Amino acid sequence: IIYPGTLWCGNGNIANGTNELGLWKETDACCRTHDMCPDIIEAHGSKHGLTNPADYTRLNCECDEEFRHCLHNSGDAVSAAFVGRTYFTILGTQCFRLDYPIVKCKVKSTILRECKEYEFDTNAPQKYQWFDVLSY
């Protein structure tokens, strides 16, 4: 399913090439960049010692953070907000990154209960781990 007016926002893309964008160009450009994240773990795939249990691809946290920033700065306010809420809030996904081992979640959001702040063991070596993606 691709969001109307875009070619890149949704499951896969329907573009004829990497330079083609839909009607909502700024939102679509954000989705295209997100789709091209170089560090991903496919659905049910493994990488960096992690296995993705989800039915969709998960990305390095840096790519998700860039995606959020891009959507917030998009001139296509309505389509960007819809895509942002769908991906970050409704999907409730996780991203991964290299960091000190998580000891526990220090602060959870009130409604969706995603972890907003983690406590880390800074004496242990860093490793790849899953992190909650915050709501849009």
Curated annotation (Swiss-Prot):
Gene Ontology terms: cellular component: extracellular region
GO molecular function terms noted in the UniProt entry: metal ion binding; phospholipase A2 activity
Function as written in the Swiss-Prot or TrEMBL entry: PLA2 catalyzes the calcium-dependent hydrolysis of the 2-acyl groups in 3-sn-phosphoglycerides.
Catalyzed reaction equations: a 1,2-diacyl-sn-glycero-3-phosphocholine + H2O = a 1-acyl-sn-glycero-3-phosphocholine + a fatty acid + H(+)
BP terms from Gene Ontology: arachidonate secretion; lipid catabolic process; phospholipid metabolic process
EC number in record: 3.1.1.4
Binding positions (Ca(2+)): W8, G10, G12, D35
Glycosylation sites: N16
PROSITE patterns the UniProt entry points to: PA2_HIS (PS00118)
Subcellular location(s) per record: Secreted
Location (main, coarse): secreted
Active-site residue list: H34, D64
Name this protein carries in UniProt: Phospholipase A2
SMART domains per the UniProt record, alphabetical: PA2c
Organism, scientific name: Bombus pensylvanicus (American bumblebee)
Keywords from the UniProt entry: Allergen, Calcium, Disulfide bond, Glycoprotein, Hydrolase, Lipid degradation, Lipid metabolism, Metal-binding, Secreted
Tissue: Expressed by the venom gland.
Cysteines engaged in disulfide bonds, as pairs: C9-C31, C30-C70, C37-C63, C61-C95, C105-C115
Cofactors required: Ca(2+)
Family membership noted in the UniProt record: Belongs to the phospholipase A2 family.
Pfam families: Phospholip_A2_2
Gene3D superfamilies attached to this UniProt entry: Phospholipase A2 domain (1.20.90.10)
